[in-house]
Amino acid sequence: MSDTLIQFGHSFQKKIIVLLLYNRRFLQTISDIILPEYFDSDADKWLVRSIKKYYEKYKVEPTLDALKIQIDDISSEILKKLVVDNLREAFQHREATDLEFVEEKVLEFCKNQNLKSAIMESVDMLERHDYDGIKNVIDVAM
């Protein structure tokens, strides 16, 4: 299993972004476990990071106006253009018929990544005989 979403393809990642922007229930469910590092492009990483930060602060998904203001603050013109292009591409998937499937798959992927990280963290704890710590880390990951 790959540590990134590249295995699912380019358009799949764009559908995740559109879900983060338009499906509050999905954003609430996945915001704690989805990481920008799972995405291929720097532009997608920037979008996911920005959506998560906005959600953490305001408890709602960002509006297009809010995103535009954040995009305008990007210092790199290349990244700014890529973010705008990727956002446009993501919006083309707003009405995709497989968004529920994408939700299920990305949630499963993120949960598995979270569990994988917890297991790796548990190895060090096992060497220290910290069994309560291991149980706690695994419980949190589940």
Give each language-model segment a name:
Residues F91-M142:
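Interdomain "pre-motor" coupling segment immediately N-terminal to P-loop NTPase/helicase cores
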Residues M1-F109:
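Noncatalytic partner-interaction/assembly domains of nucleic-acid and motor enzyme complexes
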